[in-house]
C-alpha cells in the first residue's frame, strides 16, 4: 500500500493498474488519473493469480507485472518482478507442512508457495527481498548469483507509525479496544512460526513469578485457537489476563504501541 501511495506522489506520467480480488478492502487506496483499481473475479486465490491475473495484465496492455507477496503467475508474456519476503516454506517437506500445527488454510498456502515459488523465481526478471540476510538465503537456495536479478530493498514504514503523544487520541484508542492500563502487545497469528505458544508460556511464567497486573493484548486473534494453546501450556486461567481486540484499524496501531 505504501509503495502505491508513494508512487502516486512521484509519478504522474506512467499508467498503473492495481489488480485486487473483490473481497479485498480496496478503500484504503484512492484512484488517481493514472492509477486505476481493477477488481478481478477469479475464484480462490490460486486460480485468481494463475488465470485471471495474467489475462487482465494482457487485457490492459501492461508492460510489467509486479507481484508483492511471494507468488505470481508463471504463464505470463510480459516481464515479471516478484517480491519474496522469505522462503521458510521452501525449507520444509510437504509431509512436514501437512503435519505442522498450522491451520488448514496456512498449510494450503505453504504448499501452494512451495509449488509455485521455484517457477516464479526462474520466470522473474527481477526478484526483490526485504533484507540482505534473505537475499543471501534466496541466492544460495535457488542458485542466483546475478545481483541484477536479485536485490534487497528494506521495507518502508508508513508515516503514521510514530509515537503518539496526544492524550485525546490515546484515550480514544484505549476506549475503542478496551485496553488496560498496563499491557504487553502481541502482534502475530496462528502460524507456528510466529511462536505464539511460547509467548503465552512466557507470559504465564512472568505472571506467576512476579504477580504483575499486566495484561497481554492480542490483535485479531481467534479465541478458539487461543484456548487450544492455553490447554497445551496447562494454563487455561491465563485467558483472564488476555485482551482480544478483534480487528484493529492500521492507523490505530501507533496509539496501541505507544501505550504498551
Identify the function of each model-found stretch.
Residues 1-260:
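Carbohydrate transferase catalytic cores enriched for Leloir-type hexosyltransferases
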Amino acid at each position: 500500500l505504501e509503495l502505491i501511495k508513494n508512487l502516486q506522489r512521484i509519478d504522474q506520467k506512467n499508467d498503473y493498474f492495481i489488480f485486487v480480488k473483490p473481497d479485498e478492502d480496496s478503500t484504503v487506496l484512492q484512484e488517481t488519473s493514472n492509477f486505476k483499481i481493477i477488481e478481478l473475479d477469479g475464484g480462490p486465490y490460486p486460480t485468481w493469480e494463475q488465470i485471471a491475473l495474467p489475462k487482465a495484465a494482457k487485457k490492459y496492455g501492461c508492460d510489467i507485472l509486479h507481484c508483492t507477496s511471494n507468488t505470481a503467475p508463471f504463464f505470463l508474456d510480459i516481464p515479471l518482478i516478484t517480491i519474496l519476503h522469505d522462503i521458510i516454506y521452501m525449507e520444509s517437506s510437504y509431509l512436514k507442512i501437512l503435519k505442522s500445527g498450522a491451520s488448514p488454510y496456512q498449510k494450503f498456502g505453504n504448499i501452494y508457495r512451495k509449488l509455485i515459488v521455484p517457477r516464479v523465481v526462474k520466470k522473474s526478471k527481477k526478484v526483490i527481498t526485504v533484507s540482505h540476510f534473505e537475499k543471501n538465503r534466496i541466492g544460495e537456495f535457488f542458485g542466483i548469483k546475478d545481483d541484477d536479478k536479485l536485490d534487497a530493498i528494506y521495507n518502508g514504514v508508513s508515516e503514521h507509525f510514530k509515537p503518539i503523544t496526544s492524550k485525546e487520541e490515546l484515550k480514544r484508542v484505549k476506549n475503542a479496544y478496551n485496553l488496560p492500563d498496563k499491557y504487553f502487545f502481541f502482534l502475530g497469528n496462528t502460524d507456528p512460526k510466529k511462536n505464539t505458544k511460547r509467548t503465552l508460556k512466557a507470559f504465564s511464567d512472568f505472571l506467576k513469578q512476579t504477580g504483575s497486573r499486566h495484561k497481554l493484548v492480542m490483535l485479531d486473534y481467534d479465541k478458539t485457537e487461543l484456548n487450544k494453546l492455553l490447554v497445551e501450556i496447562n494454563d487455561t486461567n491465563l485467558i483472564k489476563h488476555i485482551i482480544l481486540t478483534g480487528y484493529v484499524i492500521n492507523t490505530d496501531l501507533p496509539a496501541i504501541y505507544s501505550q504498551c
